[in-house]
Curated annotation (Swiss-Prot):
Keywords: Ribonucleoprotein, Ribosomal protein. It comes from Methanocorpusculum labreanum (strain ATCC 43576 / DSM 4855 / Z). Disulfide bonds: none annotated. GO terms for molecular function: structural constituent of ribosome. This is Small ribosomal subunit protein eS1. Belongs to the eukaryotic ribosomal protein eS1 family. HAMAP family: Ribosomal_eS1. GO terms for cellular component: ribonucleoprotein complex; ribosome. InterPro entries: Ribosomal_eS1 (IPR001593), Ribosomal_eS1_arc (IPR030838). It comes from the Archaea. One of its GO terms (biological process) is translation.
Length: 206
């Protein structure tokens, strides 16, 4: 019994030695409070990733099936500030979008938003109403990719991510693709911040 009490005491002391840090979303999302993490050393906080419901973050119920992740970049006092790290629609939601006698058109590309040193790998998916022929699938894919690449050339990183998360890019792709073939929905189902070519080259030199 004495050993158990001592063990419990050490655990309490260990928890007391740790601090809670309030994690905030990036500035383009209003620096909203998105959660808390605990650490005994503030130097160990940067680099950690927090994943939250996008629907709750931007107050849009239609985005409840989307999870967004944010990477902590720096700490000031008990506040931890993040940058966008990526997002993903739940696999269950994506599967539910696939209907019989219809086509699913996917494309994964990497874009570098205007003036940014950060790259984003995005997966675009179109769900058609009817089965599409190969030529129609290819045309849909090319149009989706063009819309996203053109948008990245015209918007900085924060503006591009905001348009992606809020569905503005999806609406633009839908409008452009609808004349090609009847589509039911087009979404960027996943994105991930990846190292730029310059960063990869610098890492090799080091």
């Amino acid at each position: 019994m004495a050993r158990k009490k001592q063990s419990g005491g050490r655990k309490v002391e260990g928890w007391k030695a740790k601090n809670w840090y309030k994690v905030h979303a990036p500035e383009f999302l209003g620096k909203q409070f998105i959660g808390e993490i605990i650490s005994s050393n503030p130097e160990n906080v940067p680099g950690r990733v927090l994943t939250v419901s996008l629907g709750e973050l931007i107050q849009d119920y239609s985005k409840q099936n989307v999870r967004a992740s944010f990477k902590i970049m720096n700490v000031a006092g008990d506040a931890a500030y993040t940058q966008f790290n990526g997002h993903e629609m739940t696999k269950e939601f994506v599967r539910a979008m696939v209907k019989k006698r219809a086509s699913r058109v996917d494309s994964t590309i990497t874009v570098t938003p205007l003036g940014s040193t950060r790259e984003l790998q995005v997966t675009i998916t179109a769900f058609t109403i009817n089965h599409a022929r190969l030529s129609q699938v290819q045309e849909l894919r090319a149009k989706m990719v063009k819309v996203v690449e053109d948008s990245a050339k015209e918007a900085d990183f924060e503006s591009f991510v905001s348009a992606m998360l809020k569905g503005e890019l999806s609406k633009k792709m839908f409008a452009e693709c609808k004349p090609i073939f009847p589509v039911r929905r087009i979404e960027i189902i996943k994105s991930e911040s990846v190292s730029s070519a310059a960063d990869r080259a610098a890492a090799l030199i080091r």
